[in-house]
């Protein structure tokens, strides 16, 4: 997968994946152990209930200790809309954590099936191509991990940087663990989507190699086309299963991220206009906004990347039509492959509401901006 991990980027990606695995085990959000005899994951009841109890205990401890009460009391007293927005966003974040951890417990069997299918694809179907380096896969994994670390640092800067916040070390530690556990959960879906993209990228590379061989008048075995057709069909089924498993997770993540971005911008406006806050303190909010948007956008970009890789397969297959293919069986296999690509695409359509891609991401940005304008007009006299 990582080209023998010979270069820095591949080694760093490998370390991040290992760190994600061990962190998920420690926090109980990946309740599986590896069975070396058959090379498959098996669900561990101990890890399953350990994760459920630990994460709900942390959430209960955070709520009881007022872990969501980050902010400036004077700003809340001056602007009730900001206070209500702040508490609503906090409640939404807690609700999202509760639901996602419950779904992680309830759907553990489905996640196990997904992970085992990915293991089969990685070490059996694509074993001969594991040494091929996929730069975008490595880059996206590294960026996601950096954004998660950035969110933790942003939280610490808000907890200790804003005047009026006085939190104990225990409360900050609990809140940080809750946030990190939440992000580890989402990281599993994110890596799964990137693996689907990587397999599609490998298939496209092999198809391009076959086109090149045909141009050089070299023979091409039609069974290879049928093999990649079968793999493409399995990836489509895997994508559908992954969407069905994680659609509620991603809906809550996108909703919570959207609300957090809006809260950061509105807090920045209120503190800048209504109160005489030091400029250094005001930098905390745009930094948090930048990191949060980056983290949210990476989840959208990963799905868009896989979708475009599926479209690229159809483009590569069209190259066969430009060649004089004399093998009837090869031509039939290519046509069948092209027909499948034309009718089935890698659209990550969640909850029957929207498809996660760049178009949806830009629509989210426009919606947030329009809603922010509405809130400013509604609460203009209090600013």
UniProtKB/Swiss-Prot annotation:
PANTHER family: GUSTATORY AND ODORANT RECEPTOR 63A-RELATED, INVERTEBRATE GUSTATORY RECEPTOR. GO terms for biological process: monoatomic ion transmembrane transport; sensory perception of taste; signal transduction. It comes from the Eukaryota. The gene is Gr22c. Signal peptide: none annotated. InterPro entries: 7TM_chemorcpt. Residues 1-11, 67-86, 166-250, 301-360 are cytoplasmic. Residues 33-45, 108-144, 272-279, 382-383 are extracellular. Glycans are attached at residue 130. GO terms for cellular component: axon; dendrite; membrane; neuronal cell body; plasma membrane. It is a multi-pass membrane protein. The keyword Mitochondrion does not apply. Keywords: Cell membrane, Glycoprotein, Membrane, Receptor, Transducer, Transmembrane, Transmembrane helix. GO terms for molecular function: ligand-gated monoatomic ion channel activity; taste receptor activity. The chain crosses the membrane at residues 12-32, 46-66, 87-107, 145-165, 251-271, 280-300, 361-381. Belongs to the insect chemoreceptor superfamily. Gustatory receptor (GR) family. Gr22e subfamily. Probable gustatory receptor which mediates acceptance or avoidance behavior, depending on its substrates. Its main location: membrane. Taste bristles in the foreleg and labial palps. This is Putative gustatory receptor 22c.
């Amino acid at each position: 997968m990582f080209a023998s991990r010979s270069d820095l980027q591949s080694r760093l990606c490998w370390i991040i994946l290992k760190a994600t695995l061990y962190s998920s085990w420690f926090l109980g959000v990946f309740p599986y152990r590896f069975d070396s005899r058959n090379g498959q994951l098996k669900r561990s009841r101990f890890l399953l209930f350990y994760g459920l109890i630990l994460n709900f205990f942390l959430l209960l401890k955070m709520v009881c200790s007022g872990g969501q009460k980050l902010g400036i009391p004077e700003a809340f007293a001056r602007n009730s809309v900001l206070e209500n927005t702040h508490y609503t966003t906090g409640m939404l974040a807690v609700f999202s954590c509760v639901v996602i951890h419950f779904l992680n417990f309830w759907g553990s069997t489905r996640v196990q099936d997904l992970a085992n299918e990915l293991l089969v694809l990685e070490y059996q179907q694509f074993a001969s191509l594991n040494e091929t380096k996929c730069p975008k896969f490595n880059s996206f994994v590294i960026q996601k991990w950096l954004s998660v670390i950035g969110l933790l640092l942003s939280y610490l800067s808000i907890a200790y940087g804003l005047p009026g916040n006085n939190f104990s070390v225990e409360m900050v530690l609990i809140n940080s663990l809750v946030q990190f556990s939440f992000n580890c959960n989402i990281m599993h879906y994110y890596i799964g989507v990137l693996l689907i993209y990587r397999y599609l990228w490998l298939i496209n590379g092999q198809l391009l190699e076959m086109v090149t061989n045909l141009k050089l008048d070299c023979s091409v075995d039609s069974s290879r086309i049928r093999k990649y057709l079968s793999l493409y069909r399995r990836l489509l089924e895997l994508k559908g299963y992954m969407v069905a498993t994680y659609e509620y997770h991603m809906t809550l993540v996108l909703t919570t991220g959207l609300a957090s971005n809006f809260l950061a911008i509105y807090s920045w406006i209120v503190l800048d206009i209504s109160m005489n806050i030091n400029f250094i303190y005001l930098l905390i909010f745009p930094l948090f906004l930048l990191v949060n948007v980056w983290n949210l956008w990476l989840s959208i970009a990963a799905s868009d990347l896989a979708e475009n890789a599926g479209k690229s397969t159809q483009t590569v297959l069209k190259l066969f039509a430009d060649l004089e293919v004399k093998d009837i069986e090869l031509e039939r296999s290519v046509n069948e492959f092209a027909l499948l690509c034309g009718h089935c695409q890698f659209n990550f359509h969640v909850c029957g509401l929207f498809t996660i891609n760049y178009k949806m991401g830009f629509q989210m940005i426009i919606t947030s901006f329009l809603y922010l304008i509405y809130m400013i007009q509604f609460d203009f006299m209090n600013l």
